[in-house]
Curated annotation (Swiss-Prot):
Residues 275-305 are annotated as: Disordered. Cargo transport protein that is required for apical transport from the trans-Golgi network (TGN). Transports AQP2 from the trans-Golgi network (TGN) to sites of AQP2 phosphorylation. Mediates the non-vesicular transport of glucosylceramide (GlcCer) from the trans-Golgi network (TGN) to the plasma membrane and plays a pivotal role in the synthesis of complex glycosphingolipids. Binding of both phosphatidylinositol 4-phosphate (PIP) and ARF1 are essential for the GlcCer transfer ability. It comes from Bos taurus. The PH domain of FAPPS binds the small GTPase ARF1 and phosphatidylinositol-4-phosphate (PtdIns4P) with high selectivity, and is required for recruitment of FAPPs to the trans-Golgi network (TGN). GO terms for biological process: ceramide transport; ER to Golgi ceramide transport; intermembrane lipid transfer; lipid transport; protein transport. This is Pleckstrin homology domain-containing family A member 8. It comes from the Eukaryota. Residues 311-520 are annotated as: Glycolipid transfer protein homology domain. One of its GO terms (cellular component) is membrane. GO terms for molecular function: ceramide 1-phosphate binding; ceramide 1-phosphate transfer activity; ceramide binding; glycolipid binding; glycolipid transfer activity; phosphatidylinositol-4-phosphate binding. Disulfide bonds: none annotated. Keywords: Cytoplasm, Golgi apparatus, Lipid transport, Lipid-binding, Membrane, Phosphoprotein, Protein transport, Transport. It is found in: Cytoplasm; Golgi apparatus, trans-Golgi network membrane; Membrane. Residues 275-285 have a biased composition (Basic and acidic residues).
Length: 520
């Protein structure tokens, strides 16, 4: 289905007409049908979103991925909204049925595998008994050849049954537990889906269980020990290493090679030492860090005395502190935008409802810059190249340009940085921290209407305890003393890196006279 719907953009532009296209379970929107060749301005996966009908406005409907993505839409009439609701609901139902069927097949295969494994254990025990019986017959020197033949026949039959059952187990396992079924995300998922990992409630360490299982399955199937680690697992392994390395003065060597494929294949062997699992390999693109203590000071042994607790900032998919600047302090576009997406959930933790307008503006500006980037990824490798390209084309200060979007994006990031700095420096009143950060950054660019919106949002700010609790990975961690240490540790790495990149952008905008005093 396709047609025009009104979409809420921001408090400045309000409701704007957009051309929407529902295809393959994905709802995409464009400025107009004629501009479709430029690529969609945004999309949402129907299988994972909620469809909500507005309680008052009978032409409005909201599409929401909780904590991640929001589409506020209005049709031109009640009948038109009804047609869209039927189409969207049908698309969601079809995708849900498909996922339910896959989950059902997965559960059935799991039960079948458990049954076969029980049979396998029975045949294994029987096989051991018959081997012992054969040894006994051989050692006692029984002359009855008939008894020896019977024992040999039974042993052969049991071996054949054991091998057949083992083969059936492997067939079920290969069908039910492939990496594609376990780790694959739905095709066409919005980029914001990467933020899901920030809401993980399980500890980082148990990842080795799934890695070990995958290695065992692949070794039986291919005859060699192969392990596939998808992007999310690679990030978790990296974060787990960084948790041990960041607080102390240690040397860490991690050799990695960028791979354009979705997965990274590592060949190696699994070794267990002192109850802890470690991954070792010889021909690998991912080398494990080696820890060398460089100091006998209390700081260098802090991990021996305190529990290392991961926080929201240490488990980000991509962090500003992970970004490596390119030549001439070039800020890599893709990594920067991914880091911006990763910090957006902080606004949800402050209040998913009252801070929704702030979040929508921030995400909207990220998407505008990304839209420019995907038009020519080879050329626009850095943010500076995007800005300079628009400066040369004399469109840098045109409304909705990538340069204008980046201007407001960096202002929004300065607000978040200012707020987090206040928290890091010991401010226990979240409302005060937000107000101080807003006064130093965004307030001068806002008119009285937008200032009023922010004032309302500030009044609804959570308590310090609730905000800190929302930054935990495991429920209850915020009550531990080590969590405060972890927050200080992570923010001490995160905020300086963020400040450095924003300073580079400030210099770029000042040199080319792109700063604007316009008030919105």
């Amino acid at each position: 289905m396709e047609g025009v719907l009104y979409k809420w953009t921001n408090y400045l532009s309000g409701w704007q007409p957009r051309w929407f296209l529902l295809c393959g379970g994905i709802l995409s929107y464009y400025d107009s049908p004629e501009d479709a060749w430029k690529g969609c301005k945004g999309s949402i996966q129907m299988a994972v979103c909620e469809i909500q009908v507005h309680s008052v406005d009978n032409t409005r409907m909201d599409l929401i991925i909780p904590g991640e993505q929001y589409f506020y839409l209005k049709a031109r009439s009640v009948a038109e909204r009804q047609r869209w609701l039927v189409a969207l609901g049908s698309a969601k139902a079809c995708l849900t049925d498909s996922r339910t069927q896959k989950e059902k097949e997965f559960a059935e295969n799991t039960e079948n595998l458990k049954t076969k494994m029980s049979e396998l254990r029975l045949y294994c025990d029987l096989l051991v008994q018959q081997v012992d019986k054969t040894k006994e017959v051989t050692t006692t020197g029984v002359s009855s050849s008939e008894e020896g033949i019977d024992v040999g026949t039974l042993l052969k039959s049991t071996c054949n049954t054991f091998l057949k059952t083992l083969e059936e187990c492997m067939q079920i396992a290969n069908a039910a537990f492939t990496s594609e079924l376990l780790y694959r995300t739905p095709p066409g998922s919005p980029q914001l889906a990467m933020l899901k990992s920030n809401k993980m409630k399980h500890p980082i360490v148990p990842i080795h269980n799934s890695l070990e299982r995958q290695m065992e399955l692949n070794s039986c199937e291919n005859g060699s020990l192969n392990m596939e680690i998808n992007d999310d697992e690679e990030i978790l392994v990296r974060n787990k290493s960084s948790l041990c390395l960041k607080p102390a003065e240690t040397d860490c060597s991690i050799s990695s090679e960028e791979n354009t494929d979705d997965n990274i294949t590592v060949q190696g062997e699994m070794m267990k030492e002192n109850g802890e699992e470690s991954l070792g390999n010889h021909d690998s693109d991912l080398a494990q860090p080696e820890l060398h203590s460089t100091s006998s000071s209390p700081e260098s042994h802090w991990e021996e005395d305190q529990e290392v607790i991961p926080t929201f900032f240490s488990t980000m998919n991509t962090s500003f502190s992970d970004i490596e600047l390119l030549e001439d302090s070039g800020i890599p576009t893709e990594a920067f935008l991914a880091s911006c997406y990763a910090v957006v959930p902080v606004l949800d933790k402050l209040g998913p409802t009252v801070f929704a307008p702030v979040k929508m503006d921030l995400v909207g500006n990220i998407k505008k810059v990304n839209q420019k980037y995907i038009t020519n990824k080879e050329e626009f490798t850095t943010l500076q190249k995007i800005v300079l390209h628009e400066v040369e084309a004399d469109v840098a200060q045109v409304r909705n340009s990538a340069t204008e979007a980046l201007l407001w994006l960096k202002r929004g990031l300065k607000f978040l940085k200012g707020f987090l700095t206040e928290v890091k420096n010991g401010e226990k009143d979240i409302q005060t921290a937000l107000n101080n950060a807003y006064g130093k950054t965004l307030r001068q660019h806002h008119g009285w209407v937008v200032r009023g919106v922010f004032a309302l949002a500030l009044r609804a700010a959570p308590s310090y305890e609730d905000f800190v609790a929302a930054l935990t990975i495991k429920e209850g961690d915020h009550q531990k003393a080590a969590f405060s240490v972890g927050m200080q540790r992570d923010l001490s790495l995160y905020l300086p890196a963020m400040e450095k990149q924003l300073a580079i952008l400030d210099t770029l905008y000042e040199v080319h006279g792109l700063e604007s005093d316009e008030v919105v």
